[in-house]
Amino acid sequence: MPAGLITALPNQLRAITMQLRLDTNGELSETSQQTVGVPFVENARMTCRKVDVHYGEKCAIKNISIDVGRNEVLAMIGPSGCGKSTFLRCLNRMNDSLASCRVSGDITLDGVNIYAPTVDVVPLRAQVGMVFQKPNPFPKSIFDNVSYGPRIHGLATGKADLSEIVESSLIKAGLWDEVKDRLHESGTSLSGGQQQRLCIARAIAVSPEVILMDEPCSALDPIATAKVEELIAELSTQYSIVIVTHAMQQASRVSQRTAYFHMGSLVEVGATEKIFTNPGHQLTEDYITGRFG
């Protein structure tokens, strides 16, 4: 057999196998929807069981079951449109604002079902904070950006207490030394990287248990990205962090576990080192090695 044909066969077989995994609607077949790896952890901060999300008649994510551990960084990776950001928004009910969105399944925070009718989404979103892809400071002073949450949630008993929360949050976000003499200036006057750390300080100020990050470094330069990644490592000693990222190198640097999503399904979850060096599913390997995605 010609050497070129021998070389080509593995790729041809992989392509055939990939096609067999897809049904006629271009979705994962039932046999490939079983998540590979270790999606569950002991004493989890958050648990998700059989979570489906529909936008009207369209199923965006299906049958997602995974835990978020205490004081861990969980990275979610996958091709654009695979459902990872949709799932992230389920964790603090950000999808509630979309009239066409329906979420089913169970998601708990410290054992409480966050979709129960008695749950108020305002305190929930304080407990499970969100940092978005594009920095979005309020058009207020740096001080007011950070103090806004503690004020409306009644976490400060007076001005001195509020000032202490602001300082502590900015210190945790690695921003205090850069802004301590300009707290009266607008948050929008900061650089992009500083604005993103300000948004992280704003989330920290209301004492969350979980911080969600949706591509937090995609709009930042490499230096600002490095600072945010260092900050994520520091914050993980106090909070659970779930980060969506397209940068696989970033996922490998900042997370303890990584989850791979594909076409609305959770394909594999496991220790980050294993996911990137010895994945258990062919779809994961193909994405990690750049064969598709």
UniProtKB/Swiss-Prot annotation:
SMART domains: AAA (SM00382). It is an enzyme of class 7 (translocase). GO terms for cellular component: plasma membrane. InterPro entries: AAA+_ATPase, ABC_transporter-like_ATP-bd, ABC_transporter-like_CS, P-loop_NTPase, PstB-like. It catalyses: phosphate(out) + ATP + H2O = ADP + 2 phosphate(in) + H(+). Its main location: membrane. Coiled coil: none annotated. Belongs to the ABC transporter superfamily. Phosphate importer (TC 3.A.1.7) family. It comes from Desulfotalea psychrophila (strain LSv54 / DSM 12343). This is Phosphate import ATP-binding protein PstB. Residues 46-288 form the ABC transporter domain. ATP binds at residues 78-85. GO terms for molecular function: ATP binding; ATP hydrolysis activity; ATPase-coupled phosphate ion transmembrane transporter activity. CDD domains: ABC_PstB_phosphate_transporter. GO terms for biological process: phosphate ion transmembrane transport. Part of the ABC transporter complex PstSACB involved in phosphate import. Responsible for energy coupling to the transport system. The complex is composed of two ATP-binding proteins (PstB), two transmembrane proteins (PstC and PstA) and a solute-binding protein (PstS). Keywords: ATP-binding, Cell inner membrane, Cell membrane, Membrane, Nucleotide-binding, Phosphate transport, Translocase, Transport. It is a peripheral membrane protein. It is found in: Cell inner membrane. Its EC number is 7.3.2.1.
